[in-house]
Amino acid sequence: MDPMKAQQLAAELEVEMMADMYNRMTNACHRKCVPPHYKEAELSKGEAVCLDRCVAKYLDLHERLGRKLTELSVQDEEVMRKAAAGTG
């Protein structure tokens, strides 16, 4: 595959994954913090605080998972490299 096409595909996938994460975060935090039947157009202070905390936790967890997955990926690559060196 052409390196430019691969880079473009990777960028498109990253945008798609970020959009998916944003949509899931929005839905989860809205369900948790905003009652299904509300009377006012503006968020209450409690709802706004809940949403702030929910988003912060969601993003923190997303960052932690990303770091852990990267760490596991590096470990897997090392194991594969050692296995390939041992059989070669």
Swiss-Prot record:
Keywords: Chaperone, Disulfide bond, Membrane, Metal-binding, Mitochondrion, Mitochondrion inner membrane, Protein transport, Translocation, Transport, Zinc. Pfam families: zf-Tim10_DDP. It comes from the Eukaryota. GO terms for cellular component: mitochondrial inner membrane. The keyword Zinc applies. Signal peptide: none annotated. Disulfide bonds join 29-54, 33-50. GO terms for biological process: protein insertion into mitochondrial inner membrane. Heterohexamer; composed of 3 copies of TIMM9 and 3 copies of TIMM10/TIM10A, named soluble 70 kDa complex. The complex forms a 6-bladed alpha-propeller structure and associates with the TIMM22 component of the TIM22 complex. Interacts with multi-pass transmembrane proteins in transit. Belongs to the small Tim family. This is Mitochondrial import inner membrane translocase subunit Tim10. It comes from Danio rerio.
